Curated annotation (Swiss-Prot):
Keywords noted in UniProt: Iron, Iron-sulfur, Lyase, Metal-binding
E.C. no: 4.2.1.-
List of residues binding [4Fe-4S] cluster: C124, C197
PROSITE patterns on file: ILVD_EDD_1 (PS00886)
GO BP of this protein: carboxylic acid metabolic process
Name used for this protein in its record: Putative dehydratase IlvD1
Top-rank taxon: Bacteria
Pfam family, one: ILVD_EDD_N
Cofactor binding: number and manner: Binds 1 [4Fe-4S] cluster.
Protein role: Involved in the degradation of galactose via the DeLey-Doudoroff pathway.
C-alpha cells in the first residue's frame, strides 16, 4: 500500500481494524461491494440534486452512472448520495429561499462522510451555486458536472425559448394579440427533453461561469442534456476527480480571484443573468475571496456581449453548443481573460480555448460586431440604493438606460397583482414602476418578481418595456429595463421603503446612478417615521433565514455560514 493511499481521508472510515472500521465497511458491503474496494483507493462522492420535482435535473441519475464508470476506470470507488434539490419552476415562495439550506446540506454531507473528493451534479438555477457554496466551505477536490440545457423548444415551425417566450406570450395574451388556446398549445413544445432552460437563463449562466472559472471540464456549459457527449463528459469527469485526489488539487486552489474575474467576464460575454452577481458573491464569501459588487463594474462593465442567445439575442443554447460552445466564446475574448488561471484539469484555463473554433458567426459574434458593446451587468448606486443595485444592459431598451420619471409604487407583490390590470391605473410609459417588500427578508428569499408585468392599459397600446425598480431578482430568461437587488432592501429599512407614488426617480445606467429626487430633509423625515413590518416568521428555517440573511450586495448568504470549516475528520460515531 502506497503512502498516498495511507494519507487519504477515507482511511479514517474504512482503513482500520477497530470496531468503527468494521461497522463502516460491513454496512457498505450490504450493497454488494467486495472487500477489495476498501483497499485504500480514493472514495469519490457524487453529490446529486436529482429529483422528479426538479425537472431540470431529472436525468442526473443517468449522468451519475457516467461519472461512476470514470471513477471505477481510474481506480477509485464511487458513492452517490442525495442532497436537497431546488426546482426553480416548482418551489414556492422561491427556490432562492432554500439555496443556503442546500449549501448547508452539501457542506455537512461532504464533511460527515468518508470521501476524498466530490463531483457536484447540479443544473437548475440555485443548485449549482448552493452546491459550490457548501463544497467551498469543506474544500476537498471538487468538479462540477452540469445537467445541460433542454433541446430547443419548437412550436409552429419555429424555435421558442424557455422563460423568455413565456414572458412574451403572456404579454401577447394580455394585449389580445394571442389567443389563450395558442398560449396553451405552445406549452408542450417549449420543454421537449430533460435539462435546464435552453435560453441564457441563470442555470446556463452559472454553468458558463463554472466552465470559465475552470471548475468543470471544457464544453460543460452548453452541450444539451440528452447529447451523448454529456454522458462522455461525465465519464471523463469521473476519471479526472480520482487524479485530483492523488494530486491534492482542492477547490481552494481553483477558486482564485483571477478565476472569479474570468467568471465575471464570461458572464458579460454570454449575456448572462443578473442572478450570477448574488451567487458569485456568496461563493466568494465561502472561499474567502475578496469579491465585491464594484468588481462586476470594474471587470465586466465594458465587456461586449457576443453570444446571440435569448433573452438578449435570438438563438438558443443548443445553437451555442453547435457553434463552438463556451471554449469558442472564450477564444474570442481571450485578450480579456486571465490565461494562466488554474483549472480542475490541472492546466491553465487558456488550454480550454486553445483549439476552439467558432462555427457560426451569428451565434457567437465577432468582436467587431457584438450583440451589444459594454454589455456587462452594471452596478448602480445613489440615494435610492446606497449599497448598490444591478441592471442588465444587454436585455434592456437602450433608450431607457438613462431615464427620469414619476414613481408608481406597489407595496407588495399582492398589491401589484391586484392593480396591474386596472384600466384606470394612473401610469404612462414614462412612469417608473417600484415594487417593495421582495428582498431577502421581505418576500422572503428575494423572489424572481422584479420583471413586473407592463400595466395592461399600456400593453394594449403597444408598450413592451418601461423602467422597473425593486429589491427582488428576476429570472435570467427575462428581459427589460429592470433595476434589481436594491440594497438595503425595503424590509431592512433601505430608502426603497420610503418611496412614494409621484416621487421622481432618475436612472442613469451608463453613469451607474440611481437617485430619488427628493430633498434630504424630506428623506430624513420619512425615514424617521418608518416602521419595520411585523415579523411573520416565528419558528423553523424561515425564522432562521429572516434573522440571519445578508443583503444582496453581500450575496444573501446566512451570516454564520460565511467562510469555511474545512474537511477535518470528525469524532467516531460509535
Amino acid at each position: 500500500m502506497s503512502d498516498k493511499k495511507k494519507e487519504l481521508r477515507s482511511r479514517h472510515w474504512y482503513g482500520g481494524t477497530h470496531k468503527d472500521g468494521f461497522i463502516h465497511r460491513s454496512w457498505m458491503k450490504n450493497q454488494g461491494f467486495p472487500d477489495h474496494v476498501f483497499d485504500g483507493r480514493p472514495i469519490i462522492g457524487i453529490c446529486n440534486t436529482w429529483s422528479e420535482l426538479t425537472p431540470c435535473n431529472s436525468h442526473l441519475r443517468i449522468l451519475a452512472e457516467g461519472v461512476k464508470r470514470g471513477v471505477w476506470e481510474a481506480g477509485g470507488f464511487p458513492v452517490e448520495f442525495p442532497v436537497s434539490s431546488l426546482g426553480e419552476t416548482q418551489m414556492r415562495p422561491t427556490a432562492m429561499l432554500f439555496r443556503n439550506l442546500l449549501a448547508m446540506d452539501v457542506e455537512e454531507a461532504i464533511r460527515a462522510y468518508g470521501i476524498d473528493g466530490v463531483v457536484l451534479l447540479g443544473g437548475c438555477d440555485k443548485t449549482t451555486p448552493g452546491q459550490l457554496m457548501g463544497a467551498a466551505s469543506v474544500d476537498l477536490p471538487t468538479i462540477v458536472v452540469s445537467s445541460g440545457p433542454m433541446l430547443n423548444g419548437k412550436w409552429k415551425g419555429k424555435d421558442i425559448g424557455s422563460g423568455t417566450d413565456v414572458w412574451k406570450f403572456s404579454e401577447a395574451v394580455r394585449a389580445g394579440e394571442m389567443s389563450l388556446q395558442e398560449f396553451m398549445a405552445a406549452e408542450s413544445g417549449m420543454s421537449r427533453s430533460p435539462g435546464v432552460c435552453m435560453t441564457m437563463g441563470t442555470a446556463t449562466t452559472m454553468a458558463s461561469i463554472v466552465e470559465a472559472m475552470g471548475l468543470s471540464l471544457p464544453t460543460n456549459a452548453a452541450l444539451p442534456a440528452v447529447d451523448a457527449r454529456r454522458m462522455a463528459l461525465s465519464h471523463m469527469t469521473g476519471k479526472r476527480i480520482v487524479e485530483m485526489v492523488h494530486e491534492d488539487l482542492r477547490l481552494s486552489k481553483i477558486l482564485t480571484k483571477e478565476n472569479f474575474e474570468n467568471g465575471i467576464i464570461a458572464n458579460a460575454a454570454v449575456g448572462g443573468s443578473t442572478n450570477a452577481v448574488v451567487h458569485m458573491l456568496a461563493i466568494a464569501g465561502r472561499a474567502g475571496i475578496d469579491l465585491c459588487l464594484e468588481d462586476f463594474d470594474r471587470v465586466g462593465g465594458q465587456v461586449p456581449c457576443i453570444v446571440n442567445c435569448m433573452p438578449s439575442g435570438k438563438y438558443l443554447i443548443e445553437d451555442l453548443a453547435y457553434a463552438g460552445g463556451l471554449p469558442a466564446v472564450m477564444n474570442r475574448i481571450q485578450h480579456l481573460l486571465h490565461p494562466d488561471a488554474p483549472t480542475v484539469f490541472g492546466v491553465p484555463i487558456s488550454k480550454y480555448w486553445e483549439a476552439a473554433e467558432v462555427y457560426n458567426d451569428d451565434v457567437i459574434r465577432p468582436l467587431d460586431n457584438p450583440l451589444r458593446a459594454a454589455a456587462g451587468i452594471r452596478v448602480l448606486k445613489g440615494n435610492l440604493a446606497p449599497n448598490g443595485a444591478v441592471i442588465k444592459p444587454s436585455a434592456a431598451s437602450e433608450h431607457l438606460l438613462a431615464h427620469e420619471g414619476p414613481a408608481y409604487v406597489f407595496d407588495t407583490i399582492e398589491d401589484l397583482r391586484a392593480k396591474i390590470d386596472d384600466p384606470d391605473l394612473p401610469v404612462t410609459e414614462d412612469t417608473i414602476l417600484v415594487l417593495k417588500g421582495c428582498g431577502p427578508k421581505g418576500y422572503p428569499g428575494m423572489a424572481e418578481v422584479g420583471n413586473m408585468p407592463i400595466p395592461r392599459r399600456l400593453v394594449e397600446k403597444g408598450v413592451r418595456d418601461m423602467v422597473r425598480i425593486s429589491d427582488a431578482r428576476m429570472s435570467g430568461t427575462a428581459f427589460g429595463t429592470v433595476v434589481l437587488h436594491v440594497s438595503p432592501e425595503a424590509n431592512a429599512g433601505g430608502p426603497l421603503a420610503i418611496v412614494r407614488t409621484g416621487d421622481r426617480i432618475r436612472l442613469d445606467a451608463l453613469k451607474g446612478e440611481l437617485n430619488l429626487l427628493v430633498s434630504e430633509e424630506e428623506l430624513a423625515a420619512r425615514m424617521a417615521a418608518w416602521q419595520p413590518p411585523e415579523q411573520k416568521w416565528h419558528r423553523g428555517y424561515y425564522k432562521l433565514y429572516h434573522d440571519t440573511v445578508l443583503q444582496a450586495d453581500k450575496g444573501a448568504d446566512l451570516d454564520f455560514l460565511v467562510g469555511k470549516s474545512g474537511s477535518e475528520v470528525l469524532r467516531e460515531s460509535h
